[in-house]
Design a protein with these regions (language model features):
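The feature encodes the CheY-like receiver
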Residues: 63, 91
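Active-site residues of response regulator receiver
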Residues: 12, 59, 87
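Acidic catalytic/metal-coordinating carboxylates
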Residues: 40, 66-69
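Receiver (REC) domain switch/output surface
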Residues: 116-129
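Acidic, metal-coordinating helix/loop segments flanking the phosphotransfer/catalytic sites
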Residues: 22, 37-55
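Short amphipathic alpha-helix used as the core "switch/output" element in two-component signaling
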Residues: 27, 46, 68-80, 97
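Two-component/phosphorelay signaling modules centered on CheY-like receiver
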Residues: 15-36
Length: 161
């Protein structure tokens, strides 16, 4: 069975950190990752609007907006790619804030390794796909319920005639 292949968008102003992430991802032997890099949040949002990605690896500290503002803007634009947030600095409340803002996971860059990141990416992508599938199923169920209600109403009207 072929290894899964994923399209990733890395939004990070540090080329060095991006190269390090790419090396870490290459070591994740159970998947293939194609990486596109954007150096600012605004460029990342524009790229995400123009191209479909399986996942976004997002640095928290960016020159034009922080990761939480990125997540808010992403949601306002209706962009659905899952996000894993990364930061070089640990802040006590940031992981909770990131998850509440819509990130599916959060890591400090100095704690990331190929096994951890590879698994986190695959799990985040799978979770996002399951959420999309559940939303589609819920929408289909609502449609069916509306159809049943309409048919019941038609049946009642026919029985009266």
């Amino acid at each position: 069975m072929a290894a899964p292949s994923y399209q990733l968008l890395v939004v990070d102003d540090s080329k060095r950190d991006t190269l390090l992430l790419e090396r870490i991802l290459q070591q994740a032997s159970d998947a293939t990752f194609t990486v596109t890099h954007m150096e600012s949040a605004k460029a990342g949002l524009e790229e995400l609007s123009a191209q479909a990605y399986d996942l976004v690896l997002l640095d928290y500290y960016l020159p034009d907006m922080d990761g939480l503002a990125f997540l808010e803007e992403k949601q306002q634009r209706g962009l659905t790619a899952p996000v894993i947030m990364l930061t070089a600095f640990g802040q006590e409340r940031l992981p909770v804030a990131a998850l509440q803002a819509g990130a599916l996971d959060y890591f400090r860059k100095d704690q990331v390794n190929s096994s951890l990141l590879g698994k986190a990416i695959q799990q985040a992508i799978e979770k996002a796909r399951l959420q999309e599938s559940a939303a589609a199923d819920a929408a289909r169920l609502r449609e069916l319920e509306e159809t049943v209600a309409r048919l019941q109403q038609q049946l009642k009207e026919q029985q009266k005639s």
